[in-house]
Amino acid sequence: PEKKEYLPVVSEEKRIFIERPDALQSAVRMGMLSLDRNHPDYLKFRVLVTLFGGYFGSRLMSNIREEKGYTYGISAGVMPYPGQGVLAVNAETANEFVKPLIAEVYPERDRLQNDLVPAEELSMVQNYMSGEMCRSYESAFSLADAWIFVQISGLRDSYFTDALDAVKNVTPEEIRELAGKHLCKEKLKEVVSGKKMS
């Protein structure tokens, strides 16, 4: 039988609300179509997304959790499905904080598009990502799984070396350029599931 392609479907709506009248908290998801692993920008884009919301010291965590106190945790990540990736921001928050939480995501995106990331902050993310990659492939079994992944995904044999090089060598200027190209505010959809607030 012929293999079917299943790609994410994009809603025309900017905001989607799913009411749960008895919910004590709301689940917030913001997302857009993004890059897959074969895109030439993907490996350095991962560094941008990690800065944005991919680790505990990220921009989103520092602002929305640490400074504003709207949530215990907020994250951003790329799900690189075959043919089409998805960028998603995830958080849970008290119902009354939904709107201010969402509103704070956009200025953090703007900062990445307009300002150069300080060298110290970029270095911290590079060290974090390099360490995570090394820990992920430190056993024979994890290396074997990684090799299988490369083969079934149709990636280059040098994929993991390329990934480490991208993390080590990306510059603040490239981060700003990637944010301008791939973090489009107009394409970012907002989905909330929780109690309706007036």
Predicted regions and their residues:
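Conserved nucleotide- and phosphate/pyrophosphate-binding catalytic cores
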Residues: A91-A94, Y106, E132-M133, Y137
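A common structural junction motif
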Residues: P1, P107-L116
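Non-catalytic beta-strand/loop surface segments
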Residues: P1-H39, T50-A103, E121, A146, ...
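Double-stranded RNA-binding/processing signature
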Residues: Y42
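Short acidic/His-enriched helical or mixed secondary-structure segments at domain edges of catalytic enzymes
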Residues: F17-I18, E66-T71, L112-T161, D165
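Charged phosphate-binding loop/patch that engages nucleotide di/tri-phosphates or the phosphate backbone
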Residues: V192
